[in-house]
Amino acid sequence: MESYDIIANQPVVIDNGSGVIKAGFAGDQIPKYCFPNYVGRPKHMRVMAGALEGDLFIGPKAEEHRGLLTIRYPMEHGVVRDWNDMERIWQYVYSKDQLQTFSEEHPVLLTEAPLNPSKNREKAAEVFFETFNVPALFISMQAVLSLYATGRTTGVVLDSGDGVTHAVPIYEGFAMPHSIMRVDIAGRDVSRYLRLLLRKEGADFHTSAEFEVVRTIKERACYLSINPQKDEALETEKVQYTLPDGSTLDVGPARFRAPELLFQPDLVGDESEGLHEVLAFAIHKSDMDLRRTLFSNIVLSGGSTLFKGFGDRLLSEVKKLAPKDVKIKISAPQERLYSTWIGGSILASLDTFKKMWVSKKEYEEDGSRAIHRKTF
């Protein structure tokens, strides 16, 4: 092991979500900073001397001035598409506006969706070790950390965020790689579908900044119906939503039609499994002796599980796919928006964590092999 004092520093935990990045120090209760995982670039010409400085905006500043900016998410479906932008966002995490610390002084725990391309992990390691010079790095699966946050060692985590939905069965602390299910239908797809439905209802949102308005409408107005056919037949009460310019928008059936996409991806012509099937199939791919326990220990995680009525709808759908006499129990922790980060904070504060990470020295000797050896 190299100079122990730096390695003994408090690790930095970064939950690198497709939609929101959460960052803070291990041992904290909640992440210190959460901001949308996008960069904004001005799309107009500066004509005044006192104009807003800078060619790239990240974090609260990008949110504040988003009307002037073209907004781009460097991550799509849990995979980084633009490494330059991703690097700028990570730089910002360490900057004086955020963690106010030097990257070379703290080990890092970074999260990743399961079944991601291994190239994604290799490139992330390369950026952290070679650009940020971190002393040590560990890349962990999001769902496992969510289970840590609930204090359990057995359960199946259904994690649905902005880019990826996945179900990971874990038994007595062992994850079962062959049972993991993942689909790339998540919150951002719901937002896109909502934008389409709102266009049909007469509201047009076309710029990247207006897409963020659609996301906010989704978070405030959408809900999951327990019986969508019945709700289609009834007259849905419209909810009035005030847009940033002061005008109002009446949101009708789009309120429950948009999140319906999570359970019926074929609404947009996608052939993926619905969320309930992802969960049930993950359990069915596990050993027969474990299934009963897993059905009674379902844990929800991620922002897309926060829709009103989500738990009830999931329960009614999973009941149809489970054996008759099996008891199904779904727990939805209140802090599930952050549970991956909280789990990371717990894991990175444990003494055993020091045995898990890849040190800079190991990385220099073995390269990306060291990363694959220590992540699963």
Swiss-Prot record:
GO cellular component: centrosome; cytoplasm
Molecular function via GO: ATP binding
Compartments, as annotated in UniProt: Cytoplasm, Cytoskeleton; Cytoplasm, Cytoskeleton, Microtubule organizing center, Centrosome
Residue runs in coiled coils: none
SMART domains: ACTIN (SM00268)
KW ATP-binding (keyword) present: yes
Modified residues (3'-nitrotyrosine): 4
Keywords: Acetylation, ATP-binding, Cytoplasm, Cytoskeleton, Nitration, Nucleotide-binding
Modified residues (N-acetylmethionine): 1
Annotated function: Component of a multi-subunit complex involved in microtubule based vesicle motility. It is associated with the centrosome.
Similarity remark: Belongs to the actin family. ARP1 subfamily.
Name assigned to this protein: Beta-centractin
Native source species: Mus musculus (Mouse)
